[in-house]
C-alpha cells in the first residue's frame, strides 16, 4: 500500500476526505434502474480508497437533494479538519430527472475542489449538436451530420448524408435511444424511426434537444481515455486506444453499441449465438495508434475538455479515414469491462483503477492551482 502514496502528488492522504457523488434516479422502471445501479462501483471505490489510505464517503444525490448535500460538504470545508474533495460521478442531462450540470455549477459556486468536467465541457458535450459544431469549427474529422429539430424536419437527409444514415438522440447516455433500427436506408424507415424517437422510451424524453442524423461509417470502432485538461498537454495522459471487436455474426450495420445489446435487455434485438459476448476488446493495429490518439486529443481540445473523457472513433473500412463519433465528459469509470470500456483501456495500458482515480484527483488540484493563479494575476 505504501507504494501507492507517490500517486498522491498534490496532497497527502491525511489532508483530505473524498466525497463520491453518485447520481440517483428515483424510478420504478427495471431497465432504467439497471442503468443506474452503482452497487458494483461502491466495492471498487472501497478498494481504491483503502489502497490510497484516504477517508471517503459514498453519497448518492438526486435532482431534488443535491444542493442540500453540497451545502453540507461545503460546511466541512470551513469547519472540518480535512479538506473535502468531491469525486463527481453525476452525468445526467437533467431532462429526465438525473442530476448533472447543476451539480457542477454548484460545486464551482461553493469553491469546492471537484473532479471531472467543468461547466463548459459538460454543457458542450451533453448535446451532440454543439459538440459536432465544435468539431466542425476545429476541423476535427467527424461523420457528416444534420440536426432534426422536428419530426417533420427530415427532407434531404439522404441527399446530404448519403446512405445509410444513423439517427440518434442529440442528448443521450449509455446508448439510450440507439438500436439497430436507428440505421435507416430510405425515407419510410427514417420517418418511422424519427416518429418513434420523438415519442420517447418508457417515459424517457429522447428528443429534448431534437435528434441528429449522421452518415453511418462502416468499419472498426475504437475508444480512447484521456485524463487531464485541454490546455495542459504536458500533464494530460492519452491512454492506449482499444478496438471494440463486435461479434462476427453481426452484419456490418449492426456493429455499434445499441442499448438493447449493450445492457442485455433484448426487447427488440437478439443476443449473440451460444451466449457469446456482444464484443471483445483488442489492441488496434500498431500503425493506427498514434493517429487515433491524435484525433482523440484534437476532439478533446475542440471541446475544451477537462477532468477526463472517453473519445469514440470509427474508421471507414474503405478509405481508412478516422472520424470522431463523440467525446464523453463524465464517462463511466470502472475497471470492470462488463460495465465500461475504461476497464479494457486500463488493462491494455497496464494501469490500475486506483492509479486512474489518483490521476483524476490530482488533476482537480492542478486545476484549482491554475484557477487561483489566474485570479491573482487578474
What are the residue ranges of the model-derived segments?
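ATP-binding N-terminal substructure of ATP-dependent carboxylate-amine bond-forming enzymes
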Residues: 1-113, 120, 126, 130, ...
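Active-site nucleotide/adenylate-binding loops and adjacent lid/helix of ATP-dependent enzymes
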Residues: 2, 14-21, 76-80, 123-212, ...
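Anion (oxyanion) recognition and catalysis
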Residues: 50, 108, 136, 159, ...
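Hydrophobic beta-strand scaffold residues
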Residues: 56, 113-114, 142, 165
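A long amphipathic alpha-helix within ATP-dependent nucleotide-binding catalytic cores
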Residues: 196-206, 260-317, 372-375
Amino acid at each position: 500500500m505504501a507504494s501507492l502514496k507517490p500517486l498522491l502528488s498534490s496532497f497527502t492522504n491525511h489532508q483530505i476526505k473524498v466525497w463520491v457523488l453518485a447520481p440517483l434516479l428515483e424510478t420504478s422502471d427495471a431497465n432504467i434502474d439497471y442503468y443506474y445501479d452503482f452497487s458494483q462501483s461502491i466495492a471498487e471505490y472501497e478498494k481504491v480508497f483503502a489502497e490510497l489510505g484516504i477517508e471517503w464517503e459514498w453519497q448518492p444525490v438526486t435532482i431534488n437533494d443535491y444542493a442540500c448535500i453540497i451545502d453540507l460538504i461545503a460546511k466541512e470545508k470551513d469547519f472540518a479538519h480535512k479538506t473535502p474533495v468531491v469525486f463527481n460521478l453525476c452525468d445526467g442531462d437533467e431532462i429526465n430527472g438525473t442530476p448533472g450540470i447543476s451539480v457542477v455549477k454548484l460545486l464551482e459556486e461553493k469553491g469546492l475542489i471537484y473532479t471531472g468536467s467543468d461547466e463548459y465541457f459538460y454543457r458542450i458535450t451533453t448535446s451532440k449538436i454543439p459538440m459536432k459544431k465544435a468539431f466542425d469549427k476545429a476541423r476535427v474529422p467527424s461523420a457528416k451530420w444534420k440536426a432534426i429539430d422536428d419530426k417533420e424536419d427530415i427532407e434531404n437527409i439522404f441527399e446530404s448524408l448519403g446512405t445509410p444514415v444513423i439517427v440518434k438522440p442529440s442528448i443521450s447516455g449509455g446508448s439510450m435511444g440507439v438500436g439497430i433500427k436507428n440505421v435507416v436506408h430510405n425515407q419510410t424507415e427514417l420517418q418511422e424511426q424519427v416518429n418513434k424517437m420523438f415519442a420517447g422510451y418508457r417515459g424517457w424524453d429522447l428528443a429534448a434537444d431534437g435528434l441528429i442524423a449522421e452518415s453511418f461509417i462502416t468499419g472498426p470502432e475504437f475508444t480512447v481515455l484521456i485524463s487531464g485538461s485541454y490546455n495542459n498537454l504536458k500533464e494530460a495522459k492519452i491512454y492506449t486506444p482499444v478496438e471494440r471487436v463486435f461479434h462476427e455474426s453481426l452484419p456490418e450495420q449492426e456493429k455499434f453499441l445499441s442499448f438493447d445489446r449493450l445492457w442485455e435487455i433484448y426487447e427488440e434485438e437478439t443476443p449473440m449465438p451460444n451466449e457469446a459476448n456482444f464484443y471483445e476488446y483488442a489492441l488496434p493495429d500498431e500503425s493506427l495508434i498514434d493517429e487515433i490518439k491524435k484525433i482523440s486529443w484534437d476532439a478533446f481540445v475542440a471541446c475544451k475538455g477537462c477532468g477526463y473523457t472517453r473519445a469514440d472513433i470509427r474508421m471507414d473500412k474503405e478509405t481508412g479515414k478516422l472520424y470522431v463519433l463523440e467525446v464523453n465528459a463524465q464517462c463511466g469509470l470502472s475497471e470492470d469491462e462488463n460495465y465500461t470500456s475504461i476497464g479494457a483501456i486500463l488493462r491494455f495500458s497496464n494501469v490500475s483503477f486506483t492509479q486512474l482515480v489518483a490521476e483524476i484527483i490530482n488533476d482537480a488540484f492542478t486545476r484549482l492551482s491554475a484557477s487561483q493563479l489566474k485570479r491573482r494575476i487578474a
